[in-house]
Swiss-Prot record:
It is found in: Nucleus. It is an enzyme of class 3 (hydrolase). SMART domains: Ku78, SAP. Interacts with KU80. Expressed ubiquitously. Residues 588-622 form the SAP domain. It comes from Oryza sativa subsp. japonica (Rice). PANTHER family: KU AUTOANTIGEN DNA HELICASE, X-RAY REPAIR CROSS-COMPLEMENTING PROTEIN 6. It comes from the Eukaryota. Disruption phenotype: Severe developmental defects in both vegetative and reproductive organs resulting in sterile flowers. Hypersensitivity to methylmethane sulfonate (MMS). Longer telomeres. Belongs to the ku70 family. It catalyses: ATP + H2O = ADP + phosphate + H(+). Residues 1-22 are annotated as: Disordered. This is ATP-dependent DNA helicase 2 subunit KU70.
Amino acid sequence: MDLDPEGLFRDDSDEDDDNVQEREANKEMVVYLIDASPKMFTPATKADEKEETHFHTIVNCITHALKTQIIGRSYDEVAICFFNTKEKKNLQELAGVYVYNVTEREPLDRPDARLIKEFSCIEDSFMSNIGSRYGITSGSRENTLYNALWVAQALLRKGSVKTVSKRIVIFTNEDDPFGGLTGAVKTDMIRTTIQRARDAQDLGLSIELLPLSRPDEEFNMSLFYADLIGLEGDEIVDYLPSSGEKLEDMTNQLKKRMMKKRKVKTLAFAITNDVCIEVNTYALIRSTTPGAITWLDSISNLPLKAERSFICNDTGALIQDPQKRFQVYNDKIVKFSTRELSDVKRVSSHHLRLLGFKPLDYLKDYHNLRPSTFIYPSDEQIFGSTRVFVALHSSMRRLGRFALAFYGNPTRPQLVALIAQEEVTSAGGQIEPPGIHMIYLPYSDDVRYPEEVHLTSDDAPRATDEQIKKASNLLRRIDLKNFSVCQFSNPALQRHYGILEALALGEDEMPDVKDETLPDEEGLARPVVVKAVEEFKASVYGENYDQEEAEAAAAKAGASKKRKALTDAAAEKSAAHNWAELADTGKLKDMTVVDLKSYLSAHGLPVSGKKEALVSRILTHLGK
């Protein structure tokens, strides 16, 4: 078998392994627990003319989350579970709990088109197939909320909490599920339910609540659910949706809260040789691209798995042993094992190592190579990381400095700048969280200096004071107030995914995608804006400026300039030959068509026709 000397230090396999590891670390399993009691089927708001219910709101939110998940988080797994139902469907045979699913799919699995399509229409058949009832009533020891938590925990048994994030999300508008009970029965059922939730949390499961307030009263977290999910003090307020009369506002709030911000990876941050803390990294705003193409089997329609095999050059047989790599040194072949190669390519024992501090004004705009990464501390593995992180963050903010660090990524080690960000809050909540931005810095050979362009004062036109004044007035008239890049979706991507969604769900009509990047014609048609535009045009081009005439004149001048350039080039090329001598000796027929046309172009003669016609035209012009 042949060894691989040139690919000794290639990172192909390492890069693939990193992608798999990062994907597994980002994988999430979610169980949606939906309250199906009769209260969920009452009108959601007082001013609701369509009589839409909280149940309808939840179905819309989960459907939207599933569609988004297929696009951006296709490896996540989801289960949908109703509690307070007449029918039961779960492996534990517990009453009042119904695990919803479709054929050819596991209860906890990646979402598919059939699940989304059938779940979005579940309201039509819910009462007849599943049914709604009050699960916790006086005179009964049945506890459907306890049963639902038990079933959800059982669904989330697969996968390790070290590599998979597991969540239980509860949707309900009942803030006191045990309000109809009294005495020791109520106390005992509350205690066992809270204990069941804490047992699940001890196993690494996260329990979240998305409460919905009824028209007649706000959702009161302190009655029960604050103890269930472990909230205290000001944390309770963050869980309450802001009050609003429109169901659309409530739906938008739920959609935002269902999409949890997830870490990209966990890094070890070495402050000194003896002090190391743990931090999580989060991706910020960056360009979105269409999903990668997945090759499918033509018969089963299942994704294909790519496999790579090595073949011996001598025998043509498959090589079963792992590939070996070597380096020729002093006319000797030095073989490397996989572990030795890994040690050679490891440039740092820590993911992130602090080098020192510099003033913030040393950092320039062009030092930012690509979108930054946000860093936040974690005490999950290294206790006390948050305390050290806060001390470092506060000192950097107070002294106006940034930290210079070495990011020991195996495939591309880089110098990074760590810039502390202060928390920004408003009456509506937190706008920007406290933390540190990791800016990727260039090496010296990455910096490109622009070429100097020498211009005289006559080369570049200068605006007059009147033109600057009119331009400033125009900018004030069309100012975009409260602008944010988050308000605009990429129309090409929206149409791309809209078509895929329509095809997957079997919809007859393609979605109508609104292009929010187009100019606001209604806003630009306002009289004050039109007046500002006309005044600016008049100050630059004059009162009697006609755009069509100007464009026609510019096109004519451009064409004339182009013709002159072609004629000059042809004249220069034809001057290299003695055409009179060529005509006398009969060698014109030996010239190429390009050379013949250069003579004709230089003298303003037609260049059409075959070679014989071109030669005849030249002879006529020469008077031969």
